[in-house]
Amino acid sequence: MVSRRVYRPRDLFSLMQSTLATENFFISACEIDIIDNFPEIRVQAEVSARENRVRRFGGEPEVLISEIYDEILKKHPQLSPATVEKIIDLEIQMEKIVLYKNSRGSCLFEKAISDGCKVILISDMYLPSAILKELLTSCGYDISNIPVYSSGEERHSKNSGKLFSIVKKNENVDIASWMHVGDNVHADILNAKKLGINTLHADWSEYNHGVSNHWKAKDIIGESICKALLLKQVSAFHQNDPLNEIGFKVFGPLLLGYVSWLANQLKIHKIDKALFLARDAHLIYKIYNEYFSEEHVKCEYLYISRASAYMVGMTDWPMHRIWHLFGGKNKKSIKK
């Protein structure tokens, strides 16, 4: 029903890290090593919380987000409970930012509702059902009268198959008329089939669950967002032809990144007005106006000949660039 705008689910923690490192509250409330290592701290806290759950109570390693952050508080007692609550709130807000309605999942959901089917949402997730409802609502779903089950709350998962049994009992579901839709082959498809539940594999959605190579990428968030454009679910956002796909996956991110940098430079250097020169800067000008027109830096599209523009910038060019422009079969002087 929803997808994320990042390549790996855990890249959300890197996005959180950027906020921890720039907002004054977190800078003053968190020690530098916590901010610098937050993605790994958050991942390891979840591992510890699940292990401790099994050690203390047996059963499945299903936990809630509050229990995950309890582990962070244990290992970093210098953090106040109030600060930890703020970080939990930040994680939920970041989920709202990266989540969006999946078009295929949305169509199935709306069709089921219009056909009068009883819809039940089941998630293997550490977020409580109330937060899951909040996230789905922020993505545009009306789920006010729809039951939502969280493995963290129920302490049983689809991964073990036991969450299906809980839903069947609580909702009085007839197995013969139950159709379960999910993207995880083991948890959503194989385990459901073992119980006699009809299934539909949501193969239109995918994620990479590998580990981020933070030491290789200078901008882990930018890398994650760009790689997310290669996932199946984003095909709904571009036409199915090679040129549109190349524009969406390659040149779109490239130009948007460049214009984002340019807009930031204009602010840093307190530029009053930016001139975008015809015709090479036409697309850059359009992108700037579309996404950065509220940056309070005036801009104008200026018609100018390439020849005069070359002369202005020639001092910054390397020799091979000058030779490329003015060399050729016919001898040319700089004047020509």
Give each language-model segment a name.
Residues 1-8:
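Asp-based phosphoryl-transfer active-site loop
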Residues 16-19, 29-90:
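A metal-dependent, Asp-based hydrolase signature
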Residues 184-199:
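Acidic, divalent-metal-coordinating active-site segment for phosphoryl/phosphodiester hydrolysis
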Residues 297-335:
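Long, charge-dense
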